[in-house]
């Protein structure tokens, strides 16, 4: 795919959704960090239901740490792997308090030093909370990048690096959200909705569907 096609793709995505947002509910960087940590192998809808119960009661490192693993588990037990996630969040809260004064750090190294926080989670926090030009490649972004030809790659890291290289700079900060939403609602895994796709004419996917 050439640069002109990529530019037009992101121009259209921006035109349709000028201010894209994550579908996870949050009001602070810490709430976002917790929500993204809980979202592994879970849906945003499921996480939002849990955090809607949790955050009014505890939404700071000190408050969640005070709940303890068992206390936190009661709020998030509807989420998959909630026991291990509760342990990770509690330990992350301890480290945030001890090392960062209860604040969420704005560096990848510091974020990835927290339990339950890998490269993808760190990228989400850096991009969404702190507006850094990072690319959190999840299953949707990986699929869309390969299927459309925007940034094909065999690994998540390869796709991430290509997106950072190829996405036009004016659109880089929001590209993560556009690609996730496009993959979630249009360029779906089993049956892409090519008939209602805004970038269908620019997409390099060979097996396009005729209906939406």
Locations of the language-model features?
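Catalytic cores of DNA base-excision repair glycosylases
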Residues: 2-212
